[in-house]
């Protein structure tokens, strides 16, 4: 790992271990699990302004869909002209077609930190205390293929699947009548990618995915009302 990345990793490690130490008298062996959930919720709370902006961007994009379709049909044979017209339309409307990706992009550094903290035996020059934490008896630093058949794997897999199902329903609800069968199929299946991704990550990262996707579902449900 490049040396300039060691500082944020060490900082995150000391924050997380301090939180674990503070709550361990009350939570016992689940201190690391609760610390991951608390930190994830804190990050998502800080990202609420971006989520609100993304929601407004998605609504604006939905309103622009008829105009976007007309431009696509009109300039189908001239990609350069189409790009210029799309950029002009976005500038006039004050929105961006990529606004919906802001919360996801902003979470990437935190996700990388979580993966790094629970996949290394040594952090900040000392033995990693975090990987000794466990969930239903399964160490947080182990990967899911090793945990197949254990209660931790089964519970987390079921919960991720349930959250993905709700996420797919919300995604389908956001599509309008112009949506193609392919886009509907993608919206229905894409949320289950978190379940597939978690299979190749440490258990702690799977817990992070469960927490953040559950937050996303709750947040979108509230914003769509």
Spans of model-derived segments:
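Helix-loop-helix
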Residues: 1-225
């Amino acid at each position: 790992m490049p040396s300039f990345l060691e500082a944020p990793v060490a900082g995150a490690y000391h924050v997380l271990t301090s939180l674990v130490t503070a709550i361990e008298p009350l939570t016992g062996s689940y201190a690391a699990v609760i610390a991951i959930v608390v930190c994830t919720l804190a990050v998502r709370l800080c990202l609420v302004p971006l989520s609100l902006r993304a929601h407004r961007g998605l609504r604006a994009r939905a309103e622009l869909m008829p105009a976007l379709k007309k431009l696509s049909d009109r300039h189908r044979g001239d990609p350069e002209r189409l790009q210029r017209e799309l950029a002009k339309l976005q500038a006039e409307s004050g929105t961006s077609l990529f606004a919906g990706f802001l919360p996801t992009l902003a979470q990437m550094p935190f996700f990388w930190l979580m993966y790094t903290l629970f996949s290394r035996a040594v952090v900040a020059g000392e033995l990693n205390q975090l990987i000794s934490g466990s969930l239903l008896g399964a160490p947080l630093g182990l990967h899911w293929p090793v945990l197949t058949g254990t209660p931790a794997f089964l519970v987390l897999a079921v919960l991720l699947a349930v959250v993905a199902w709700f996420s797919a329903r919300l995604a389908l609800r956001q599509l309008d009548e112009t949506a193609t069968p392919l886009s509907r199929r993608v919206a229905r299946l894409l949320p289950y990618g978190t379940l597939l991704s978690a299979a190749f990550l440490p258990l702690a990262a799977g817990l992070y995915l469960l927490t953040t996707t559950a937050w996303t579902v709750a947040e979108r449900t509230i914003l769509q009302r």
